[in-house]
Swiss-Prot record:
Coiled-coil ranges from the UniProt annotation: none
Cited Gene3D superfamilies: 3.30.420.40, Divalent-metal-dependent TIM barrel enzymes
Pathway(s) the chain acts in: Carbohydrate degradation; L-rhamnose degradation; glycerone phosphate from L-rhamnose: step 1/3; Carbohydrate degradation; L-rhamnose degradation; glycerone phosphate from L-rhamnose: step 2/3
ATP-binding found in the keyword field: yes
GO-annotated biological processes: L-lyxose metabolic process; rhamnose catabolic process
Entry keyword Metal-binding: yes
Family recorded in the similarity comment: In the N-terminal section; belongs to the rhamnulokinase family. In the C-terminal section; belongs to the rhamnose isomerase family.
Keywords: ATP-binding, Cytoplasm, Isomerase, Kinase, Manganese, Metal-binding, Multifunctional enzyme, Nucleotide-binding, Rhamnose metabolism, Transferase
Protein name according to UniProt: Bifunctional enzyme RhaA/RhaB
Cofactor(s) in the UniProt record: Mn(2+)
Annotated spans, Rhamnulokinase: 1-465
């Protein structure tokens, strides 16, 4: 195991060369090279520039080789139906004309009239689409019959690329089935059908199934690329490769969502009934001789075209956001052929709306919502048809491919169909391609083993059916009236809170074990109780759990790391030697999510912290070790800021103190000050690094005296222009942080806040929606300080599901901010200034019974996250599908 393979995945708008390998840890997948693709007008037809594409493929191979990956095999997949013809010398006779070219107009209708729809469907099982290869060949026969006479080889686009690499001509089975020329029962070319349509049988190559090794690179190609690769035919139809990586068992309807949306189920035998034909379902080939019973739906092509035509630079995420805010309600039939290649997609959509008597969408948000709602309606109809035709109910819809990232569609589809929608992996096509190559080389025994790997290697997101949007919206509208009667701008409150990032602490996910090779016992007064199953065991699992938690939390996110989460490839690295390279996986992950990273030196749980002293230690060697560790952490934080485009808050907290009354309080504090001065000697751009210091009043092992007390760090921060961090669990039980914030804000431009929940002497319980949390949020909102505060969480609880702990705590922080934003602060201040304390108290109490829950549900709904009654079901599903499997794996290892 462990050899890299290359999967070339080309779609209608772009192509990628992906590298992947199978290992004991799962599947390592990385993008090596990306390039654009677009049909171009050539010789009067819309064509794919296959020469350009093959040049890009070769560039990608070279990049992989030059990066030291040492790939051993390669396989190509593309879209379906399009082809080239070769002459007897292997030279191309035709361009690869696109399926969107109008040359086939009217051809399909003529075939149906002369041959009969039922007869053709019973033989091929393929849906009637005007761009099918059969109709392209018949158009070519009519327009350029001499080309068919000269043709010695028919190769579909990925077959052609394989030929250019090896000199070997083959037709791959899954893609060949889309031609409407393969017999669905024999799974071979239908020679009788070819003769009846007057197509030369000799140009069609023997069908090869996915996993066939067709040869190595030609000598000239090997020399040009500087590598020897074995070419293994995957499922060359991109959808077939994507379905091969479907992580769920056969209990789901799948949607392979990209430029096209292909919705269906996987069968062992075809369904060629009258009902299937009437609904225009197709029976395409799959990996392992399976049948992909599916329906072609327009997919994201329409939104891609709208995005291309809109003035300005609209991203797909911006369009999705605009759609979520739109009130447009019209739906059109996205499966009409008029949307295949219109001159102007926006005008075509608007005209379709006019013809149906619908309001005409004008704004980007209305256009996007019209497309999304229409797609969802088409999906819903297809699911209903699948259940009726197959005679089986399906409880889940699994979306794979790039469209799985569209939370707006995913949630609305779950609501409309009343089925759980599972989204991911997004790179299913490349993964399926690689799995087939691995099976061919004996790394995996069969596709089921590969799918099991996918289940553990790639995170998925669950979207459960929510209460009907009209129900949530109607309750919200009713509640909104009550709040507006108090003079509150509800929409402004939503917008304000949505922009506040909350930094989620990674250490909740693994009970502060970290990922260091050198195992260290917890120290510094830190302890984690509980043993709930499913603890993350490595960085990949921790990131996967974090992604699941973040998918349940509305608003902006950040993630807070400790230095003990370095990933050093099994090489022991001391903390004072940590480098940016040890956090590259975290940065790559954060980039993929568009979030920032905050950072903390880990100045505990180490032999050099065993006696409870670190930066204040009397031993200079130990102090120097920790100084160098903190310096390394600031450098790593600067790397985070540079790579992610947002400052990284790097926070220093040390456990230094004494259990009993010390005989010298001053000297340890002098040493701590000198250590901090040494750490901060190097200047960093505040656009990259925000230096923060955190105090504590007492702790286990420092009950009598803490070196870095509140007074110490407050004065140090003031004198040295550092941010002061208030931790809600680091003060005496009679003190509350909400009472300190206004005093601090008078003298500090920025503050940092760690939100926890103290319980007696323990400071780090899961945050609940209690009075103090609400008061903290109220202080920040009414003093207009949300832009001056950096909010993070800091708790750890191993007695409950760790993802649930993240969700509960962070949702409560966001909930408290929204609660505060929906208060009439100006009026309450006025009552106080006027001395009308009776009215002030009455209003404060009255607000506690306002329908805030309806506001919160609407806020969550708009951002595509589960409401208060729904998120726990998602966590329980994740626990069953992912976290509990870790326990069984640990048991096997024992």
């Amino acid at each position: 195991m462990g050899e890299y393979r290359l999967a070339v995945d080309i779609g209608a708008s772009s192509g990628r060369v992906m590298a992947g390998k199978i290992s004991e840890a799962g599947i390592d997948l990385q993008e090596v090279y990306r390039f654009d693709n677009q049909a171009q007008l050539m010789g009067g037809h819309y064509c794919w520039d296959v020469d350009h594409l093959f040049g890009e493929i070769k560039k990608g191979i070279r990049v992989a080789v030059q990066s030291g990956l040492q790939p051993v095999s390669i396989g190509m997949n593309t879209w379906a139906v399009d082809f080239v013809l070769l002459d007897e010398k292997g030279e191309r006779l035709t361009d690869a004309i696109s399926y969107r070219d109008p040359r086939t107009n009217g051809v399909m209708e003529g075939v149906i009239e002369t041959y009969g729809k039922k007869a053709l469907y019973e033989r091929t099982g393929i849906a009637f689409q005007p761009f099918n290869t059969l109709y392209q060949l018949l158009a070519l026969k009519k327009q350029n019959p001499e080309l068919l006479e000269q043709a010695h080889a028919f190769l579909m686009v990925p077959d052609y690329f394989h030929f250019l690499l090896t000199g070997v001509k083959v037709n791959e089975y899954t893609n060949a089935t889309t031609t409407q020329l393969v017999n669905v029962h024999t799974k071979d070319w239908d020679r009788q059908l070819l003769k009846e349509f007057g197509l030369p049988c000799g140009m069609f190559q023997p069908l090869q199934h996915p996993g066939t090794k067709i040869g190595s690179l030609t000598e000239s190609m090997e020399k040009e690329l500087g590598v020897q690769l074995e070419v293994i035919v995957p499922a060359t139809h991109d959808t077939a490769s994507a379905i091969a990586a479907l992580p769920e068992k056969q209990t789901s309807v799948y949607i392979s969502s990209g430029t096209w949306s292909l919705i269906g189920i996987e069968n062992r035998t075809p369904i060629c009934s009258q009902q299937a034909m009437a609904a225009n379902f197709t029976n395409e080939g799959g990996v392992g001789s399976r049948i992909r019973f599916l329906k072609n739906i327009m997919g994201l092509w329409m939104i891609q075209e709208v995005q291309r035509l809109l003035p300005g630079h609209w991203s797909f995420s911006q369009l999705a956001q605009a759609a979520s805010e739109s009130t447009y309600t019209g739906e059109i039939d996205v499966d009409q052929h008029r949307f295949l290649k219109p001159e102007n997609m926006i005008e075509e959509i608007q005209q379709a709306c006019r013809e149906k008597g619908l309001a005409v969408p004008e704004s980007p948000g209305d256009l996007a919502k019209c497309i999304y709602d229409s797609l969802i309606a088409s999906y819903d109809k297809a699911v209903t048809e699948i259940e009726a035709i197959s005679g089986k109910p399906y409880e889940q819809i699994h979306i794979i491919g790039g469209g799985a990232l569209n939370k707006e569609i995913n949630q609305r589809l779950a609501n409309r169909t009343n089925k759980t929608v599972i989204a991911g992996p997004t790179e299913a096509t490349a993964v399926g391609n690689l799995l087939v190559q691995a099976i061919a080389d004996g790394e995996l025994s069969r596709i089921e083993e590969g799918r099991a790997l996918v289940r553990t290697a790639f995170p998925v997101t669950y979207f459960l059916p929510q209460r009907s949007e009209s129900h949530v919206s109607s309750r919200f509208e009713s509640a909104k009236v009550q709040y507006e009667q108090l003079g509150i701008d509800v929409e402004a409150a939503f917008a304000k809170v949505k922009q506040v990032p909350i930094s989620v602490h990674c250490w909740q996910g693994d009970d502060l074990h970290g990922t260091e090779v050198i195992a260290n016992e917890l120290s510094g007064g830190i302890d984690v109780t509980g043993n709930h199953p499913g603890r993350a065991r490595n960085g990949e699992e921790l990131r996967r759990d974090l992604e699941k938690a973040l998918s349940l939390i509305p608003g902006k996110h950040r993630v807070n790391l400790h230095a003990m989460y370095a990933e050093t490839d099994s090489v022991p690295i001391e903390r004072d030697q940590l480098k940016t390279e040890h956090f590259e996986k975290w940065v790559k992950w954060a980039k993929s999510l568009g979030i920032g990273l905050d950072f903390n030196p880990t100045v505990f749980s180490h032999p050099k912290a065993a006696d409870g002293l670190t930066l204040a230690h009397p031993d200079e060697e130990i102090r120097t070790f920790w100084i160098n560790h903190c310096k390394a952490c600031r450098k790593i934080a600067a790397y985070f800021g540079e790579q992610l485009g947002t400052p990284s808050l790097v926070n220093i907290w040390v456990p230094d103190g004494y259990k009993d009354t010390p005989s010298d309080r001053l000297t340890p504090r002098k040493r701590l000050k000198e250590s901090l001065d040494a750490i901060y000697a190097d200047e960093y751009d505040p656009m990259l690094v925000l230096d923060t210091v955190e105090s504590k009043l007492f702790g286990i092992g420092s009950e009598a005296y803490v070196v870095g007390s509140h007074e110490f760090y407050l004065n140090y921060a003031n004198q040295n222009n550092k941010l002061y961090l208030l931790d809600t669990g680091h003060f005496h039980p009679t003190e509350v942080v909400s009472n300190k914030l206004s005093a601090m804000l008078l003298f500090h431009d920025q503050l940092a806040l760690h939100v926890s929940r103290p319980v007696r002497w323990d400071s780090d319980h899961v945050v609940t929606f209690d009075d103090e949390l609400r008061e903290i949020a109220i202080e920040l909102v009414r003093n207009d300080a949300l832009g001056n505060i950096h909010i993070g969480l800091d708790f750890f609880d191993a007695s409950i599901n760790r993802v649930a702990a993240w969700a509960i705590g962070t949702r409560n922080m966001a909930k408290a901010l929204l609660y505060a934003a929906l208060m009439p602060h100006r009026h309450l201040k006025q009552l106080q200034d006027e001395g009308d304390f009776t009215s002030r108290l009455a209003m404060q109490e009255q607000l506690k019974t306002y329908p805030f829950g309806d506001m919160w549900d609407e806020y969550c709904k708009r951002q595509g996250v589960p409401t208060e009654t729904e998120w726990l079901d998602v966590v329980k599903e994740y626990e069953q599908q992912v976290q509990l499997k870790r326990e069984s794996e640990k048991a096997k290892q024992r």
